[in-house]
Amino acid sequence: MESRDPAQPMSPGEATQSGARPADRYGLLKHSREFLDFFWDIAKPEQETRLAATEKLLEYLRGRPKGSEMKYALKRLITGLGVGRETARPCYSLALAQLLQSFEDLPLCSILQQIQEKYDLHQVKKAMLRPALFANLFGVLALFQSGRLVKDQEALMKSVKLLQALAQYQNHLQEQPRKALVDILSEVSKATLQEILPEVLKADLNIILSSPEQLELFLLAQQKVPSKLKKLVGSVNLFSDENVPRLVNVLKMAASSVKKDRKLPAIALDLLRLALKEDKFPRFWKEVVEQGLLKMQFWPASYLCFRLLGAALPLLTKEQLHLVMQGDVIRHYGEHVCTAKLPKQFKFAPEMDDYVGTFLEGCQDDPERQLAVLVAFSSVTNQGLPVTPTFWRVVRFLSPPALQGYVAWLRAMFLQPDLDSLVDFSTNNQKKAQDSSLHMPERAVFRLRKWIIFRLVSIVDSLHLEMEEALTEQVARFCLFHSFFVTKKPTSQIPETKHPFSFPLENQAREAVSSAFFSLLQTLSTQFKQAPGQTQGGQPWTYHLVQFADLLLNHSHNVTTVTPFTAQQRQAWDRMLQTLKELEAHSAEARAAAFQHLLLLVGIHLLKSPAESCDLLGDIQTCIRKSLGEKPRRSRTKTIDPQEPPWVEVLVEILLALLAQPSHLMRQVARSVFGHICSHLTPRALQLILDVLNPETSEDENDRVVVTDDSDERRLKGAEDKSEEGEDNRSSESEEESEGEESEEEERDGDVDQGFREQLMTVLQAGKALGGEDSENEEELGDEAMMALDQSLASLFAEQKLRIQARRDEKNKLQKEKALRRDFQIRVLDLVEVLVTKQPENALVLELLEPLLSIIRRSLRSSSSKQEQDLLHKTARIFTHHLCRARRYCHDLGERAGALHAQVERLVQQAGRQPDSPTALYHFNASLYLLRVLKGNTAEGCVHETQEKQKAGTDPSHMPTGPQAASCLDLNLVTRVYSTALSSFLTKRNSPLTVPMFLSLFSRHPVLCQSLLPILVQHITGPVRPRHQACLLLQKTLSMREVRSCFEDPEWKQLMGQVLAKVTENLRVLGEAQTKAQHQQALSSLELLNVLFRTCKHEKLTLDLTVLLGVLQGQQQSLQQGAHSTGSSRLHDLYWQAMKTLGVQRPKLEKKDAKEIPSATQSPISKKRKKKGFLPETKKRKKRKSEDGTPAEDGTPAATGGSQPPSMGRKKRNRTKAKVPAQANGTPTTKSPAPGAPTRSPSTPAKSPKLQKKNQKPSQVNGAPGSPTEPAGQKQHQKALPKKGVLGKSPLSALARKKARLSLVIRSPSLLQSGAKKKAQVRKAGKP
């Protein structure tokens, strides 16, 4: 809304109402409202809102610097400093600071005086003392944040005095006034500080060392005005023996004050700088930090020590760094990292990482200090295991010399661990452990070596793009050598042999090195491109490593393998190298690069497991030779040669065997290699993959591929990042596990099988424990018999316990095998994804539909575990996104057309038999995909089948014509299949099929609508559920462009007429709904009718709507009687939407005054009913209305008692008000004919509105004589009426159409015009 210009004159009405108010009063109020809103937004918690409101306030005040708004703004902001909401006070303080900064002409002393007068500490009540204290504090802070306080000497002195006064209220403000005072004095000039210093700093050293703020003020003065401080206090040595305990107490207080803020107190860093300046850092660190704060066993003090350590790194020299990183602080930090493992515990490690990263990034030109800090943190170990993770992000800040030195240190520590140089510790739980093996040096060496090898791999993993190639090669050769080789005799040709082990490398450590090496291969071999998979020479990293391994194998006198090669295995290695040379001739082909990658990887695996990889390597070489030496493949239009070489099948088996191994690298290699050979895939090779995915085959039969359990390797790989918390809690966890097993065993023992029960009864009967009726007279069992019975029972229960354990082990074994099988199937799905992505036009893709559906169907029924969920999600993603929604598909079916038609029928039937809709949706989408394939293939391959059908007696008249005749799609068969499915969906109550399925069918294959839409039309007048579903489907289908394009104009018009006739038949019972189902039935019919109107209007179809209009008007009275039923508003809106399309406007409901309603004598019924909210008769004034029915004073005529019905309530009168106007005119209420239609006998045929206009005038419709001069609105109405029910846009203008609708309402009988007539008659009767 825009404000009125003050120069504009006011209207007479406004002048009368406003009196003597100024012309711009409204604009001033508008600005004031906007102005006041700023202060509300300033106090909101959102920072963006506060800043925006402050900026708008300043901009607003800049236009009125001398106005009253400035005074109000200052008053409002000062008031806000002491509001009850504590979160709003800093907001007002910041806004006041920015205001004072923007308007420098505002005197600070005046503002400070207003604050002190507003919040006078001497006169304020006790309940308001705390807000007043904070108001004064935030007021001073606002003056300081404006930047003007240090320049105004008078205001500065007053502020200092006020802060000193506020410092006495420590219970409320704590140390905030003193902190503010230190912050202010740190900004003032030296001359000002010399002048103020005697007033703020006492000469007593005890007071100076009593609080952090006093000490910080002392350090500030010592830094800026040392001469003045010396005159005031004298010479002071803070690090003397007497003052060290006081410094410790001050630092402890500072640590407690920032416990919630989690930051380093400024006083601690100032003391550190002072100690460095006075060359007293060793004394400060040893006595104050390590011997003082650290010994308190107070975690805030410990965190202060950690933060001080991190902040001190950039300030220390190399010698000082060595002092700090070998002390108790870093050891205590390591203990904290090891013990802080619970989710809710505070972890300082991320904060320390930030300190170290900042230090490394800031000293790029000093690699020695970088190396010293990184080595120091890597030397903090828990029984040999460093506390820093193997993957440490701060390594990326190392300069190249520091990185090279760090890698050299790691390699040296791996070969010759120096345990004495480590800052090693043990946790409390480890110290309590009685196991002596936990404290053996061999165990510490193993833990250290395992961490080092994974740290080397992580460095290459994170920095292999930035690292020098020589350094990467050093790490890779180091890992390869110590994974598979052992030094016999050092040689200069192999640098790795020059450094012997100080501790022998154990087999467990060598397995960790091997695992880390293959992880390194995954990093270096993820791609076939120049970076990162290849070196600068263009060869892959794996090729260089194979060449290095061949060099080691050739130096058998100096180096030997961990697992010695046999003659056959060495021949396989040599043949592999020969095959690599042959592949170099085909290096231009991408397939050759994939084969080379596979061959190199399996060749390296020959070093790890020679017996398993030897045969595999030979098969790969055979497949490579056949693949590269075969002739070009023939086109897909020809039949596949059954004598095709089986190299593809062999290679697929090899890839499946590689996928069975627990290696992500193998998974990537298998995926890449299969992408290059999938174009040569044969049905038998595909069947090998499907056998793995088929649940019936893979679960019931013995798998051809042995799946390897990867839990051990995963545990081995993830162990290096974990601390010793498992060992700390080992005893407690074992006790809990044993208790859990015992409880579980007891529960299982409760359900004893029948065989064990019979055996128990036999033993008891044999011991005469269960006798007959005369058992009481028998003697008790003797000791020998009792012992024999006990022994028998013990042996029986022991056997039962073994059986239970065996069943439990068998169940665990089956679950583990099932988990491994599911994991293997998830990996094999990689090959399926590659096939459907890279070869979607391959005919073999069609063979994947039912196996994938089988997996989805099984997983949806039993998707309890995470692996089942992963398998389901991956299968569904491949099926939906890569297969059914693929842009390309098979265009060469050959003789598969008949089988695909049968498969379509089978899939649709399976969809109708599924227990739920999600499963049915996948089957239905599969059938749509096959329809797309059949529709997109030419009929050349289907000629033979078509001829056979014609010979069998198929009517050629029903065969498709046009474009459909050129495809393989058998339209009659497909139509029959989907017609059956549609009928089942409409008639079956719990059908898994849904409306979106058939909408997808109609949109993708609209040619089927010619046969399926009549089924929907047939069910429009059926039972409740089929009618609702049919109407819903027709609503969506009739508006589809694809469906309309499949019908000729006469056919489409005929279909619209059929739908209109069915809907008209449904609407004959409109308004008679008694149940929810009947109400929904009426809603669906009206919705379909409106969709039909929109479709006809859009396409300009001509339909006869006379019968429909009569039906709708005939049901208007019954519809109004249920006007207030539940859910009827939607029904009325749809009804009048349809009537509006037919030219009938919805009557407006007007509220009438009580004076215009004729009064009537109240009936006894109305007198008995007491209305809620009305006065009783005894309380009403007597001079209200005469009891004998005489007219009232306002001249309104009273109706006779016989002409008025009994008085009813307001709601009843509103529901029946449509009947009253007709009675007021003196005519009986009858069913009104259509608007503009003459009253005729039932035998008279219905005429279109156009003929009615010619034969009869509009004025004669109501039986009244026509007027001499016809109004213009009626002429326009004749043009606006539908021409034989044509639903479309009229050529008239909008105004003409509006007048036409009004004239139609005027000429409509009874109900539509009764309200206007009655109102006119009442007004005429009231005139004298």
From Swiss-Prot:
One of its GO terms (cellular component) is intracellular membrane-bounded organelle. Residues 1151-1328 are annotated as: Required for nuclear and nucleolar localization. A motif (Nuclear export signal 2) lies at residues 263-281. The modification N6-acetyllysine is found at residues 71, 158. Residues 1166-1184, 1209-1218, 1316-1328 have a biased composition (Basic residues). The modification Phosphothreonine is found at residues 1190, 1196, 1239, 1244, 1269. Residues 1-22, 698-753, 1146-1292, 1306-1328 are annotated as: Disordered. The modification Citrulline is found at residue 1307. There is a cross-link at residue 1148 (Glycyl lysine isopeptide (Lys-Gly) (interchain with G-Cter in SUMO2)). It is found in: Cytoplasm; Nucleus; Nucleus, Nucleolus. Residues 1-582 are annotated as: Interaction with MYB. Binds to and represses JUN and MYB via the leucine zipper regions present in these proteins. Also binds to and represses PPARGC1A: this interaction is abrogated when PPARGC1A is phosphorylated by MAPK1/ERK. Binds to and stimulates transcription by AHR. Binds to KPNA2. Interacts with CLOCK and CRY1. Component of the B-WICH complex, at least composed of SMARCA5/SNF2H, BAZ1B/WSTF, SF3B1, DEK, MYO1C, ERCC6, MYBBP1A and DDX21. This is Myb-binding protein 1A. The lineage of its organism: Eukaryota, Metazoa, Chordata, Craniata, Vertebrata.
